[in-house]
Amino acid sequence: MARITAEDCNKIIPDRFRLVVLATRYAKLLNYKVETNQIKKEKRDKPPVIALRRIAAGKVSVAQLEQDLINSLRTRTMIEPLVNQDESEAVEEKFEYLSEVYIGEDYSDLDDQIFIDENGEDYETDK
């Protein structure tokens, strides 16, 4: 068989970037000897060449490769909530004494303040 090229695989996976990612993943699986019996038959070829040949021949399930790739990239299977309701109630209880203080997103109260730089000199904030 002649050298395999990316054009041979374009019929199966039209996007070259996707082809590279999936072929790399499959080559890594081959390199870790997931399919040891089949590698021995094609021993003279390296795993990337074997992966590209199998993708071009349609012997590899692209959907299964994609799912395997996604699963390998996941760090956690379930995302835990950042704040539980009990914790948020506890935080509210800690700041009950600040009920008179209004905290908003408006920073206009900073306009009247005088800021001092490192040398102890005043500078204006209107610049």
Swiss-Prot record:
Its EC number is 2.7.7.6. It is an enzyme of class 2 (transferase). GO terms for cellular component: DNA-directed RNA polymerase complex. It catalyses: RNA(n) + a ribonucleoside 5'-triphosphate = RNA(n+1) + diphosphate. Keywords: DNA-directed RNA polymerase, Nucleotidyltransferase, Transcription, Transferase. The keyword Nucleus does not apply. Pfam families: RNA_pol_Rpb6 (PF01192). One of its GO terms (molecular function) is DNA-directed RNA polymerase activity. PANTHER family: DNA-DIRECTED RNA POLYMERASE SUBUNIT OMEGA. The RNAP catalytic core consists of 2 alpha, 1 beta, 1 beta' and 1 omega subunit. When a sigma factor is associated with the core the holoenzyme is formed, which can initiate transcription. This is DNA-directed RNA polymerase subunit omega. It comes from Rickettsia peacockii (strain Rustic).
